[in-house]
Amino acid sequence: MSVLWPCKNSASFSWTAPADRSHWTGPKAGRADVTGGGVACQTAAMEDAAARALGRVAANGIELAYETFGEAGGPPVVLVMGLATQMIAWPDELCEGLARCGLFVVRFDNRDAGESTHLRDLPAPRLADIVVRRRPPPYSISDMAGDVAGLIDGLGLGQVHLVGASMGGFIAQVVALEHPGRVRTLTLIMTSTGSRRVGQPKPRVYARLLRPPVAADRSAAMAAAVETFRLIGSPGFAFDEAYVRDLAGRSWDRGYDPAGRRRQLAASAGQPDRTAELRHLAVPALVIHGLHDPLVAPSGGLAVARAIPGSRFVGFSGMGHDLPRALWPEFVDEIAALTAAGGQRRRRDRPAG
């Protein structure tokens, strides 16, 4: 689809996919109301910090480290991060903003990342094997989706509002497909369907993805992160080098694992095309994508939105493959609006009595 429908915010574009996916319609006028469905969004009230707690939970045969924001009685939101990226890459301010909307926010480290279980007994695939898919990966995106389902069950969350970024978006899609009873709404950020015909990276970025520098120490890890995010980040927004350095340093302290990264990369490279399955997904869905993403081209997000019936696509001009600070309030508003709408839909669909 080549037609762009401008939102009220001139920096973004929005499409809504009807249930039959036969055509696209323009966005509703104005900003979505984020006060409905029992979710009272108070992103302007920044005085009181959201309650936070750290923990570990057994899930799918491993242990996952997690952190929560907000009160446990609120609608649960689970945030799934991407390749070789730890839960702290979900900015504290974004998590706290969602919590101030009355949501109970859970971020966690995937397997082979941060403080969760590192599967060092499994082989770390060679680059050549990953590229040509010569051998099955040590584990799959489906296995990682099973981790998320185990986290949801282990924390007693029931149905959650699931948010996935990059590879986390792959994982979130598979959770919704393979564990549908655990997902109330689905938000997918800078991700794709698994098809090799859409969402492909630029050659220079692909080379960096396959051969990232192996850091010898904390300082080198920070420098490498700056180099990477200058390559894949958002050209339309100021580059926050101090933030990137701080995040990379804290990630080094929590657990740097190049072999784990290769195992995750193999899982990502080995995933199938989910387009046909996504066409049968019956869950309120939002797809957010940077219109200048050099790692997962916008065609990937558009393909996801076109496949999921009734989904909404929001594309931000100037956004690359990161979460620019200037857009954090936009992300909070969009996610909170979807959770409110999803909660209302769930109450309407619930049988009487």
Residue ranges and their predicted role:
Residues P201-A276, V283, A303:
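Alpha/beta-hydrolase
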Residues I62-V131:
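Conserved HGGG/HGGXW glycine-rich cap/lid loop of the alpha/beta-hydrolase fold
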Residues M1-T25, R31:
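Low-acidity, Ser/Thr- and Arg-rich intrinsically disordered low-complexity segments
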Residues S311-G353:
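Catalytic active-site module of serine/aspartate enzymes centered on a nucleophile-bearing elbow/loop
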Residues S142-V160:
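Conserved acidic catalytic loop of the alpha/beta-hydrolase fold
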Residues L177, T185-A216:
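Flexible "cap/lid" loop of the alpha/beta hydrolase fold
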Residues L281, V287-H289:
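Short beta-strand/loop motif that positions the catalytic acidic residue
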Residues H292-V296:
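Acidic catalytic loop of the alpha/beta-hydrolase fold
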